[in-house]
């Protein structure tokens, strides 16, 4: 799983199901693909979204700011700063500074995530705030590790509140990952279209998959409901590749 796919998975796992989730998924996909480069408009859109908690907006704002190239002097947004202040608790700020010092020594996404997971959500948010306010700098990869650790903690608490049995991999994250991977597989199918006779058939399969993912995000589904989705998609893609004599290795 690529780094950006992992980030997309974790961030979407904390967004409540509904039409807005499908919209945010599309925005993230566009941002990570370099298709959306207007950070100012993106932040204005995010600020006015209903339903999302201030912290979720703050995390999304942080991710957009990390990913979208922007002018050096672009002003930081108050709604993100307020969300990432650790509820104004000085203890959170103290812990955030300690965490930041540890993160400065990390160079990998997974290393940063591992270190961050031992801190509270408030301390993690405060640490993001430090970086967002340019009071500290880490590599983008390390910052994404911090983001995913925060999302995992939030998803864990949401999962516990659903009174479902906690397994080693959080079902909300696993469910979201299936949908993100299914969506990416559909995109890969579309990119391979060309002008062959089978192109229309494959575009149809990809389109159906996209619609299914969007519907699942919009109406909300149980985490186990996406289990067969990715496998069905991969099967369709591999069957198509086999007919076309294309190497299948890349999409396994």
UniProtKB/Swiss-Prot annotation:
Subcellular location: Virion membrane; Host nucleus
A Pfam family it matches: Flu_M1_C
UniProt key word RNA-binding: yes
Keyword Magnesium applies: no
GO terms, biological process: viral budding from plasma membrane
Residue ranges of the region described as RNP-binding: 165-252
Gene Ontology CC terms, in alphabetical order: host cell nucleus; membrane; virion membrane
Recorded GO MF terms: RNA binding; structural constituent of virion
Motif Nuclear localization signal in this chain: 101-105
Keywords in alphabetical order: Host nucleus, Membrane, RNA-binding, Viral matrix protein, Virion
Membrane-binding as annotated region, ranges: 1-164
Family the entry assigns: Belongs to the influenza viruses Matrix protein M1 family.
Complexes and interactors: Homodimer and homomultimer. Interacts with NEP. Binds ribonucleocapsid by both interacting with genomic RNA and NP protein. May interact with HA and NA. Cannot bind NP without genomic RNA.
Protein name: Matrix protein 1
Lineage, top ranks: Viruses, Riboviria, Orthornavirae, Negarnaviricota, Polyploviricotina
């Amino acid at each position: 799983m690529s780094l950006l796919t992992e980030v997309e998975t974790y961030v979407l796992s904390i967004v409540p199901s509904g039409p807005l989730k499908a919209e945010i998924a599309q925005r993230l996909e566009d941002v990570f693909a370099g298709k959306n480069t207007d950070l100012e408009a993106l932040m204005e859109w995010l600020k006015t979204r209903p339903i999302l908690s201030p912290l979720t907006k703050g995390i999304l704002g942080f991710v957009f700011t990390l990913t979208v190239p922007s002018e050096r002097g672009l002003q930081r947004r108050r709604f993100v700063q307020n969300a990432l202040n650790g509820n104004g608790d000085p203890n959170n700020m103290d812990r955030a500074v300690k965490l930041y010092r540890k993160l400065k020594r990390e160079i990998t996404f997974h290393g940063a995530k591992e270190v961050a997971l031992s801190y509270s959500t408030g301390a993690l948010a405060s640490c993001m705030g430090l970086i967002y306010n340019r009071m500290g700098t880490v590599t983008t990869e390390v910052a994404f590790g911090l983001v995913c650790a925060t999302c995992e903690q939030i998803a864990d608490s949401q999962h516990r509140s659903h009174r479902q049995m906690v397994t080693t991999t959080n079902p909300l994250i696993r469910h979201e990952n299936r949908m993100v991977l299914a969506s990416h597989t559909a995109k890969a199918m579309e990119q391979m279209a060309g002008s062959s006779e089978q192109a229309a058939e494959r575009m149809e399969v990809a389109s159906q998959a996209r619609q299914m993912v969007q519907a699942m995000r919009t109406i909300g589904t149980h985490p186990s409901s996406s289990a067969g989705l990715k496998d069905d998609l991969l099967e369709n893609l591999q069957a198509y590749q086999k007919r076309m004599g294309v190497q299948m290795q890349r999409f396994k």
